[in-house]
Amino acid sequence: MSIRERLLATVSQYIAAYNEFDPSAMKTVRTPTCLSHGIAPTCKFTQSVEEHTRHMMLSRGVFRSVNASIVDDDTTVVDEVSRHVVVKVKIRCETTVGPYENEAIFIMAMDEEGALVDGIFQFLDTARFQQFQGRLDEAQESKN
């Protein structure tokens, strides 16, 4: 398998694990030192694997199903030398406050073998994310 094929296979495995929305599945495709970064100006964060696991566990109470898919393979960028892959992703979720859809750019840095994700930079459509966050806030306020 060429390095390009290996990198793309790792991206596919990451997306499959993302769709399971299970922290243990996510850990199988990430290095122990992998960091997740939100890079949108209104949605900035950096999480270690452990922090990401805690975040997912808390989010499981909100997300009933998650379906992420690569939007267009023609827009995927693979840099074999630096072991980076850039993909445009469509995310569809069923949540406790109804459907949530968003698009994102994932910039994924892989380990030397190209078999594990060593860092991921996510750029979400923040307008859609803020609308969803508003629905969550309204639902929480109506409970109080």
Swiss-Prot record:
Pathway as given in its UniProt record: Secondary metabolite biosynthesis; terpenoid biosynthesis
Name of the protein in question: Austinoid biosynthesis clusters protein S
Description of how the protein assembles with itself and partners: Homodimer.
Species in which this protein is naturally found: Penicillium brasilianum
Family: Belongs to the trt14 isomerase family.
Family matches, as PANTHER family: AUSTINOID BIOSYNTHESIS CLUSTERS PROTEIN F-RELATED, AUSTINOL SYNTHESIS PROTEIN F-RELATED
BP-aspect Gene Ontology terms: terpenoid biosynthetic process
Other comment: In A.calidoustus, the austinoid gene cluster lies on a contiguous DNA region, while clusters from E.nidulans and P.brasilianum are split in their respective genomes. Genetic rearrangements provoked variability among the clusters and E.nidulans produces the least number of austionoid derivatives with the end products austinol and dehydroaustinol, while P.brasilianum can produce until acetoxydehydroaustin, and A.calidoustus produces the highest number of identified derivatives.
Summary of the function given for this chain in its UniProt record: Part of the gene cluster B that mediates the biosynthesis of the fungal meroterpenoid acetoxydehydroaustin. The first step of the pathway is the synthesis of 3,5-dimethylorsellinic acid by the polyketide synthase ausA. 3,5-dimethylorsellinic acid is then prenylated by the polyprenyl transferase ausN. Further epoxidation by the FAD-dependent monooxygenase ausM and cyclization by the probable terpene cyclase ausL lead to the formation of protoaustinoid A.
Signal peptide start-end: none
